[in-house]
Amino acid sequence: MAFRTLDDIGDVKGKRVLVREDLNVPMDGDRVTDDTRLRAAIPTVNELAEKGAKVLILAHFGRPKGQPNPEMSLARIKDALAGVLGRPVHFINDIKGEAAAKAVDALNPGAVALLENTRFYAGEEKNDPALAAEVAKLGDFYVNDAFSAAHRAHVSTEGLAHKLPAFAGRAMQKELEALEAALGKPTHPVAAVVGGAKVSTKLDVLTNLVSKVDHLIIGGGMANTFLAAQGVDVGKSLCEHELKDTVKGIFAAAEKTGCKIHLPSDVVVAKEFKANPPIRTIPVSDVAADEMILDVGPKAVAALTEVLKASKTLVWNGPLGAFEIEPFDKATVALAKEAAALTKAGSLISVAGGGDTVAALNHAGVAKDFSFVSTAGGAFLEWMEGKELPGVKALEA
């Protein structure tokens, strides 16, 4: 897809640029506990400020449901944002109206201002064109730098793109280019790892992927449902037995498209789900009635390693086992390290996303070695489902 970036925006000196960022950060009291999202804003905000623009940051924080709520005011993160950006940040306690316009006029070229929480206004989440028109009066240009909110058609993520010349910020650009390389126009063979507890939450992802990838690696609790559909007794493992027919449909679709589905040949089982219980590593055919599958076994990991070695592109969403409890993190860590090594060697483009996935890659210590790790959550999942994202669609040139 073609979209305009900051390279296309032209001279912004003295111009007012409304920039949508994702600043929805976790807090403990008045302390930001994870500033990843604040840091993602640095390239776009500082580039525009250095070019002399008046940078007006729009963002949401929490779920105030269309009502002002001091607990969710963006004033609370102004100082943390200033610290990350390395420059002063003004605060304007509105997103529209005369007082906000006067505050914007008073800013010097190159200044950065954080506007109030967009979700304090009922029209934001309804994508109200009247609110979009009011907010647009504050700006000359609109930049969307928040891929993580791109699956929402809100005023600040979609509506403004129809009221002002619209561009993708640097973080948005980086995300879109990485996703295009992973599934849009990838280098084949393409492998996808899809894990997590339930098939039901990733049905659309699986259906989309069988038509796009050469190898589909199934892990986590959802692998149990796939195994059960093939007649394997999975004991008391987490399993959606009622979805066996649906899974058979996915197998049939994969056969038509030539996509090979990989399921574990051996597994790690325990009788209870807790840290370091007695475990057995066994072929999938040997699971006892009182045992549950909690990780993929070493033979399966070795086979999957060969799949990655033969692939050129990898898309990863979801862990292979119950990685949050040792020792059921071993398969995820081993395969993640292999993917990272192949990426560093230049033989694999690796793109990963989703909350559990990011946590698993950080746990394995390899997130920095993947080609791209998306922190976008819902937007990343909808992209994997093949859905059109309103915030991205609105930026198309």
Swiss-Prot record:
Transmembrane segments: none annotated. Its EC number is 2.7.2.3. Substrate binds at residues 22-24, 37, 60-63, 119, 152. Pfam families: PGK (PF00162). It catalyses: (2R)-3-phosphoglycerate + ATP = (2R)-3-phospho-glyceroyl phosphate + ADP. It is found in: Cytoplasm. Its main location: cytoplasm. Pathway: Carbohydrate degradation; glycolysis; pyruvate from D-glyceraldehyde 3-phosphate: step 2/5. GO terms for molecular function: ADP binding; ATP binding; phosphoglycerate kinase activity. GO terms for cellular component: cytosol. Keywords: ATP-binding, Cytoplasm, Glycolysis, Kinase, Nucleotide-binding, Transferase. The keyword Transferase applies. InterPro entries: Phosphoglycerate_kinase, Phosphoglycerate_kinase_CS, Phosphoglycerate_kinase_N, Phosphoglycerate_kinase_sf. GO terms for biological process: gluconeogenesis; glycolytic process. ATP binds at residues 202, 324, 354-357. Monomer. Belongs to the phosphoglycerate kinase family. PANTHER family: PHOSPHOGLYCERATE KINASE, PHOSPHOGLYCERATE KINASE 1, CHLOROPLASTIC-RELATED. This is Phosphoglycerate kinase. It comes from Zymomonas mobilis subsp. mobilis (strain ATCC 31821 / ZM4 / CP4). The lineage of its organism: Bacteria, Pseudomonadati, Pseudomonadota, Alphaproteobacteria, Sphingomonadales.
